[in-house]
Every structure is written in C-alpha cells, then in structure tokens.
C-alpha cells in the first residue's frame, strides 16, 4: 500500500490540517481505515490520537482510492468537532476492547 499526498491545507478555524491523498493497493483489497491511518501518522509525523481518516473512496476498476484525513492540534479539538461515528471508525478493535473492560 502506497500513500500519495496531493493536498495539505491548514485550517486555522478548526485548529487542524486537512489532508487529501491517494492510496494505491496493487493486488490486495481496499485497505482498512485503521491501516491507512497508521501509515498517514508515520508519513505526517502526527499523533495517532489526534488524526482521523474521514473517508476513503475506491476508484471503480482500479487498485486506487481517494482519501481525506484531518490532523488536529489537540485531542480535545478532535473530540469537540468530529462526530462519534468518525471517531468510532478510526478506533482499532483492540482499543475498543480496552474501553469495554473499564
């Protein structure tokens, strides 16, 4: 899986960076959002807790997808602005299991 970032815009109103990217995945299924998020965190040198992948739209008939991610300044900004559904789909199964145990 390769990620090619083609737009990185600063949004000062929401204290975040807005990232648009292409994901290329030759010979495999469309990657999970959590896998894409992990790779983006490494590429952008951001914190995993303050990064969300908003959506990934596969191209029909091609091993390629268009994605949109947001990197917030703080976790508090992310929790205040993002919907629970976006936060939930960016949470890994192991993190959810830990929260259920508490």
From Swiss-Prot:
Keywords: Ribonucleoprotein, Ribosomal protein. The keyword Disulfide bond does not apply. GO terms for biological process: translation. One of its GO terms (molecular function) is structural constituent of ribosome. GO terms for cellular component: ribonucleoprotein complex; ribosome. Disulfide bonds: none annotated. It comes from the Archaea. The keyword Ribosomal protein applies. InterPro entries: Nucleotide-bd_a/b_plait_sf, Ribosomal_eS24, Ribosomal_eS24_CS, Ribosomal_uL23/eL15/eS24_sf. SUPFAM superfamilies: Ribosomal proteins S24e, L23 and L15e (SSF54189). Belongs to the eukaryotic ribosomal protein eS24 family. This is Small ribosomal subunit protein eS24.
């Amino acid at each position: 899986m390769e990620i090619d970032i083609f737009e990185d815009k600063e949004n000062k109103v929401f204290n975040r960076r807005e990232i648009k990217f292409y994901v290329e995945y030759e010979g495999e299924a469309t990657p999970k959002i959590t896998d894409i998020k992990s790779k983006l965190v490494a590429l952008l040198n951001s914190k995993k807790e303050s990064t969300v992948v908003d959506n990934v739209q596969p191209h029909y008939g091609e091993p390629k997808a268009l994605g949109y991610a947001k990197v917030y300044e703080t976790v508090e900004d992310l929790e205040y602005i993002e919907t629970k559904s976006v936060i939930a789909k960016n949470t890994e199964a192991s993190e959810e299991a830990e929260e259920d145990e508490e």
